[in-house]
């Protein structure tokens, strides 16, 4: 919607550009998710997975869209500040305990206030699941991946 063929790395200038693009399209992103859900929902149950900003969008989609069966949110930075939202589907969240952008005390408050949301924390940093980042943690990524597959199997199959 904003710029074609955007592919960003994880260096400082790319992250800065990504934040600017996010600010320009936050509202439209949920509309795009809704359109994608609509497109595939005739095939059966639909789930979403997001990482970082996408993790926050997956949380928002779970709370604002009623035709989702599952949502998986990896280290969504906005999630603790959206604690007032109530999901309409089953949700699984993954957070890194060493993530300085998402304070673990806020994650704990979120977890306590949302007992129906499966929330896991890992001894890892933000981006622990991305093998293109220095924060990648193979062990934690594997555990989170296995939990994600199990969750999706339970909720989509």
Regions found by a protein language model. Give the residues of each.
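N-terminal cap/leader regions of alpha/beta-hydrolase-fold enzymes
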Residues: 1-157
